[in-house]
Design a protein with these regions (language model features):
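Carbohydrate-binding surfaces in secreted/extracellular proteins
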Residues: 259, 360, 430-460
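Flexible glycan-contacting loops in extracellular carbohydrate-active proteins
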Residues: 459-485
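Short, aromatic/His-centered strand-loop micro-motif at the edge of beta-sheets
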Residues: 413-436
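Metal-dependent phosphodiesterase/phospholipase catalytic core, i.e.
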Residues: 38, 97-204, 234-238
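Secretory/extracellular carbohydrate-interaction modules
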Residues: 338-407
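N-terminal export signals
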Residues: 1-17
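Short carbohydrate-recognition loop motifs
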Residues: 318-342
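C-terminal active-site rim and adjoining tail of enzyme catalytic domains
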Residues: 134, 207-321
Length: 492
């Protein structure tokens, strides 16, 4: 048995109940779902292909590596969690990705040089998730024992000691809690812990970084693995846009070890690699990327937290995320010239092939000095790959409104310049004044108009080239001081 082998090796080595979307709440449903202990063996037999592993819990939309994040991922259906482990100076194991507290918490400095008493004085703080998560009391950094006690045997856990000093204590805890059958050892592909885990009979999650993506490095990594392990590759080269060559993925797949990509944020990215025969995806938004239907027909900006499927270019970036500036508003106002959000929570639109309308309101806090500045709504995309004006990876259209009131409709695609389909003049926008906009999509035509000015001109275009169901919205302006606020976005 795996557990028996793991125990021997380890001893030798180290002689929607509560609503999980509400910050701070969420009760794991794993115990209600499981009919028996979930082991690596049972998960491998039942997971099918493709499968998904929850990355940092649901780290795109919840404070990463927190109990609410892990609970949310399990509530979404995850049967495998990825968990990072560090150790404090007094030997307490905690769940945190970085070696220091700086990036994700209110604490400062290295975990390893501070005692566990610091945990009572800090909390997880990731502003890009929304102000609902930055209110007091902040979400706590959990102890590993708390995580293993709640989820052990209910889901598979991929455990990584980010600080290698934590590895012996981490594995001793796993053994003490009788969880060896339910744990996969996660480690960097060249780690000395991989042969140690293999010798103990434990399966391995071996990952590469973008800098490692060569045939030679992949060959060396897979030489240490077998079909019971996972070879985990980055899905992009670090720009969140560019996929690796098909030939490289084929070479990795040829070794026979199940191939997994990470960290997946968008459905299109998972679909691309699944078509190449990749077995699984490590995803930071399990409930979104593991499904293919819309979760809502209107925004949830009043909640003051990012929604599942709502994606800036880089989901972990504070500078590219929206901000929540009033009761029900999302504001785009960073120092970036282009700031766009994929509205995946509303996608794919169920009526994409027939007729629907999009309605929302927008206002600039001050009018941009840049004459080319515009609000932009991208629509009819075939997938949820990232879009911003001037960068389109999918076929579709975008509708714009300039501060001078001009409305325009364009068609765009990855291999052709934007094509202006039509335009109309409406009264100029005033700073702080809300404009309500409406886009109507039918099988043969597109209408873009000001719903707040029903007698003004509209753009009517007869074009049926693309009718996908994905959306993005954003602003383009060289005048980064002008923030654009959005509210009341709905699909009907």
């Amino acid at each position: 048995m795996l557990g028996a082998l793991g125990g021997l090796g380890l001893l030798a080595a180290c002689s929607r109940a509560a609503d999980p979307s509400t910050p701070g709440s969420g009760t794991s449903s794993a115990s209600r779902r499981a009919t028996g202990p979930v082991t690596v063996r049972s998960w491998a037999a039942e997971r099918g292909t493709p499968f998904h592993i929850a990355h940092r819990g649901a780290g795109d939309i919840y404070p990463e590596h927190s109990m609410p994040s892990y609970r949310a991922a399990v509530e979404m259906g995850a049967q495998c969690l990825e968990v990072s482990v560090n150790m404090t100076s007094d030997g307490v194991l905690i769940c945190l990705h970085d070696l220091s507290y700086d990036r994700t918490t209110t604490g400062k400095g290295l975990v390893a040089t501070q005692p566990s008493s610091v945990l009572s004085r800090i909390g997880i703080r990731q502003p890009q998730l929304g102000p609902a998560w930055t209110r007091s009391p902040l979400t706590a950094v959990p102890r590993l024992e708390t995580v293993l006690t709640e989820f052990g045997g209910k889901v598979v856990i991929c455990l990584e000691a980010k600080d290698d000093r934590a590895y012996p204590a981490m594995m001793a805890m796993v053994a003490r809690l009788n969880l060896l059958d339910s744990v996969i050892v996660k480690a960097y592909h060249s780690s000395v812990r991989i042969p140690e885990a293999k010798a103990a009979g434990l399966p391995v999650f071996a990952y590469l970084s973008p800098a490692d993506m060569t045939v030679a490095t992949i060959d060396a990594a897979t030489a240490r693995l077998d079909r019971n392990d996972l070879l985990v590759l980055p899905y992009d080269n670090g720009d969140y846009l560019t996929y690796y060559p098909d030939e490289l993925i084929a070479a990795a797949k040829a070794h026979g070890t199940p191939l997994v990509v990470y960290p997946i944020h968008r459905r299109a990215d998972a679909a691309h690699y699944f078509k190449l025969g990749v077995s699984g995806a490590v995803t930071s938004d399990y409930g979104y990327t593991s499904t293919d239907t819309a979760a809502a027909t209107s925004d949830n900006w009043a909640s003051k937290r990012i929604s599942s499927g709502e994606k800036p270019k880089m989901p972990d970036s504070r500078s590219l995320a929206g901000s929540w500036t009033a009761l029900n508003e999302l504001t785009l106002g960073t120092d970036e010239k282009r700031q766009f959000i994929t509205l995946g929570q509303l996608c794919p639109i169920a009526a994409a092939a027939s007729q629907y309308r999009l309605t929302f309101s927008a206002a600039w806090d001050r009018l941009p000095a840049d004459p080319s500045a515009a609000l932009s709504l991208a629509f009819c995309h075939l997938d949820d790959r990232y879009y911003e004006d001037g960068l389109s990876l999918s076929e579709g259209y975008h509708a714009t409104m300039s501060p001078d009131g001009t409305l325009r409709l364009y068609r765009h695609g990855p291999s052709a310049p934007d094509e202006l389909l039509g335009q109309a003049r409406t009264p100029p926008v005033q700073a702080g004044q809300w404009a309500t906009l409406r886009l109507i999509v039918s099988p043969q035509a597109l209408i873009w108009r000001r719903a707040d000015l029903p007698d003004s001109e509209q753009v009517l275009v007869h074009d049926a080239a693309v009718r996908g169901g994905y959306l993005a919205i954003g602003r383009s302006s060289a005048d980064v001081r002008a923030a654009l606020a959005l509210r009341e976005f709905s699909v009907s």
